[in-house]
Swiss-Prot record:
The lineage of its organism: Eukaryota, Metazoa, Chordata, Craniata, Vertebrata. It is found in: Secreted. Residues 1-23 form the signal peptide. The gene is SERPINA3. This is Alpha-1-antichymotrypsin. InterPro entries: Serpin_CS (IPR023795), Serpin_dom (IPR023796), Serpin_fam (IPR000215), Serpin_sf (IPR036186), Serpin_sf_1 (IPR042178), Serpin_sf_2 (IPR042185). It comes from the Eukaryota. SUPFAM superfamilies: Serpins. One of its GO terms (molecular function) is serine-type endopeptidase inhibitor activity. Although its physiological function is unclear, it can inhibit neutrophil cathepsin G and mast cell chymase, both of which can convert angiotensin-1 to the active angiotensin-2. Belongs to the serpin family. It comes from Pongo abelii. The record marks 383-384 as: Reactive bond. Glycans are attached at residues 93, 106, 127, 186, 271.
Length: 423
């Protein structure tokens, strides 16, 4: 009979919001200046990371949609993957392999060191200051006061993931919960509140990842043009929503006849853009089934600047919270949640097991721009109606929205908007 050891719970929390203020991390990722050789090597690794993260993002999206097909979806795949990569710093053997392969890394082509290096470089890139775009991403550890962590883990957590560390009294669960929730609320400018609802009585450590994004449209909508209009939930059912509009704009556009959808890219000031995918009526499931890295690449490669006479987009604010344990099991990350978990790289002992993975995201889309946080899937719907010689695009039925920083090509947020009035 297997002897059961007392296990200590470890929580993994992910939060995200997208506002227009640039956050400056309190803890720099690396004080040293990277050499040209490291930069060149990092570029190669970063391209691989972007491709891998897109694969993970769409795999995760499909699982989230299966869980609640009739609800809005918003999450930050990059925030979730970063949190799991951060966790893998302390994992060994099968636990480590499952986490990294679950993130869609090919471990015969990419070493563990290269994976962490690419996340380090990505965090450094995303946290660079800009007057036009506010984007910050960071990590933190909340550690039971009596728990002793390995120096190597602490050093790598700070060097590679810029993690802050906070001594926490988890015996006082109310105070610990407030400490963590206040931290996340502060880092997301008040947009993510009450990330933690409950703490396991055996919790000894909580890892947190947050992302904050706020950007202004390169071509903003005029609030005076916003009016109440129908958003179709189905052919016969609709809700009235505030509908923003733009007239006579030239922007990247692609009509995908193969998948029966229209793709429009709206750019933010700074290095980011939002990709809106509007399936034809009753074609959403077909488009979702083909959400693959190669599909996204084909869309982006096919975009061409086109004059759009009228574009209509709903103004909305949506949020979702997810417990990701069961979904991660479907993606092959299993052992970390069981008594077989090997997270001995954190404390030196095999007495830690992941008890919960919580993700919460908020997305606001309005006339001036977009706000979103941490694990956020951006939802904006696109509907195309062509009236020769005019091009009119109406996001007045369910659509997808993807926010991408142009300098990394990783997916910050993915959103599916089923109902703009569904908070």
């Amino acid at each position: 009979m297997e002897r059961m050891l007392p296990f200590l719970a470890l929580g993994l929390l992910v939060a995200g919001f997208c506002p227009a203020v640039l956050c400056h991390p309190n803890c720099p990722l690396d004080e040293e200046n990277p050499t040209q050789e490291n930069q060149d090597r990092g570029t190669h690794v970063d391209l691989g990371l972007a491709s891998t993260n897109v694969d993970f993002a769409f795999s995760l999206y499909k699982q989230l949609v299966l869980k609640a097909p009739d609800k809005n979806v918003i999450f930050s795949p990059l925030s979730i993957s970063t949190a799991l990569a951060f966790l893998s710093l302390g994992a060994h053997n099968t636990t480590l392999t499952e986490i990294l392969t679950g993130l869609r890394f090919n471990l015969t082509e990419t070493s563990e060191a290269e994976i962490h290096q690419s996340f380090q470089h990505l965090l450094r890139t995303l946290n660079q200051s800009s007057d036009e775009l506010q984007l910050s991403m960071g990590n933190a550890m909340f550690v039971e006061e009596q728990l002793s962590l390995l120096d190597r883990f602490m050093e790598d957590a700070k060097r590679l993931y810029g993690s802050e560390a906070f001594a926490t009294d988890f015996q006082d669960s109310a105070a610990a919960k407030k400490l963590i929730n206040d931290y996340v609320k502060n880092r997301t400018r008040g947009k993510i509140t009450d990330l933690i609802k409950d703490l396991d009585s055996q919790t000894m450590m909580v890892l947190v990842n947050y992302i904050f994004f706020k950007a202004k449209w390169k071509m903003p909508f005029d609030p005076q043009d916003t009016h109440q209009s129908r958003f179709y939930l189905s052919k016969k059912k609709w809700v009235m929503v505030p509908m923003m509009s733009l007239h006579h704009l030239t922007t990247p556009y692609f009509r995908d006849e193969e998948l029966s959808c229209t793709v429009v890219e709206l750019k933010y000031t700074g290095n980011a853009s939002a990709l809106f995918i509007l399936p034809d009526q009753d074609k959403m499931e077909e488009v979702e089934a083909m959400l693959l890295p190669e599909t996204l690449k084909r869309w982006r490669d096919s975009l061409e600047f086109r004059r759009i006479d009228e574009l209509y987009l709903p103004k909305f604010s949506i949020s979702r919270a997810f417990n990701l344990e069961n979904i991660l099991l479907q993606l092959g990350i299993v052992e970390a949640f069981t008594s077989k978990a090997d997270l001995s790289g954190i404390t030196g002992a095999r007495n830690l097991v992941v008890s919960q993975v919580v993700h919460k995201a908020v997305l606001d889309v309005f006339e001036e721009g977009t706000e979103a946080s941490a694990a956020t899937a951006v939802k904006i719907t696109l509907l195309s109606a062509l009236v020769d010689p005019m091009t009119i695009v109406r996001f007045n039925r369910p659509f997808l929205m993807i926010i991408v920083p142009t300098d990394t090509q990783n997916l910050l947020f993915i959103s599916k908007v089923i109902n703009p009035k569904q908070a």
